[in-house]
Structure formats: C-alpha cells, structure tokens
Amino acid sequence: MALHNLQPAPGSTHKTKRVGRGQGSGMGKTATRGQKGQKSRTGYSQKRGFEGGQQPLQRRLPKIGFTSNVVKPHAINVDKVKKVAQLEEITMETIRSVYKLPKYVTRVKLIGSSVQEIVSKIKDDNISYSGQK
C-alpha cells in the first residue's frame, strides 16, 4: 500500500449526474427544474430561514437574553455577622479573614441597622453600606 495507489472502496462513490447537457442524457432542456416559474429561473435562491410565507421560526420564538456586566456587590448583614462590626479597620482583606467570601466577590455591601455605627472604620472603596447617599 502506498499513497499513489489508494482509492475508495468499490461502490462507495458515484459519478455526479450532469444536467442540462442534451436530451439524450435524460436530464436535458429543463434540467430537472420543471416548467416555468420563479424556481426555474437562473439566479433563484430563497433567503435563509424562509418558510414559504409561514412565520419563520426565528420570529415565532421570543427574544431572550441580556446579561448586565455590572458586578453587583455581595451583601453582608452586619447584625448577623458580628465579627465584621468588631473589626478595627474594615477592608476587603479583613472581611475575607472573618467572613468566608467566594473568590469572585470583589465588592461588598454592608447592610443592617447597626451599619451607621461602623461607617468610620471602612477604609476600602470596594465596600459600600446601606443608607449611603
């Protein structure tokens, strides 16, 4: 076996039928297009998705999808997580040390009724709090 004598298995390939090459071929004259009409003319092609006047699938289905790229802050209730309120300086690192945050969380919002008491301790721009103006 060598590259120069490789050939497909017998019967696996067929010669393509050449249409419009004389009446003796059985596919001459109209070349399998039938008589007259738009589909028999040269240059004819339907646009993609055309279903013969029926409402196309892409118009029948509802429009979906929009995902905001704005990263929403992870909310931490200070009343429930007392350790956050006891920190001397509140930064992302100190919050991570006392509260288990997922790695993807980059912004935090402190909520709860006792937030106003610890506002002066916040030293990070990525930390906001409820009632902020």
From Swiss-Prot:
Record keywords, A-Z: Ribonucleoprotein, Ribosomal protein, RNA-binding, rRNA-binding
Top-rank taxon, per record: Bacteria
Region (Disordered) location: 1-62
Regions that span the bilayer: none
Protein family membership: Belongs to the universal ribosomal protein uL15 family.
HAMAP family according to UniProt: Ribosomal_uL15
Protein name: Large ribosomal subunit protein uL15
Organism of origin: Nitratiruptor sp. (strain SB155-2)
Gene behind this protein: rplO
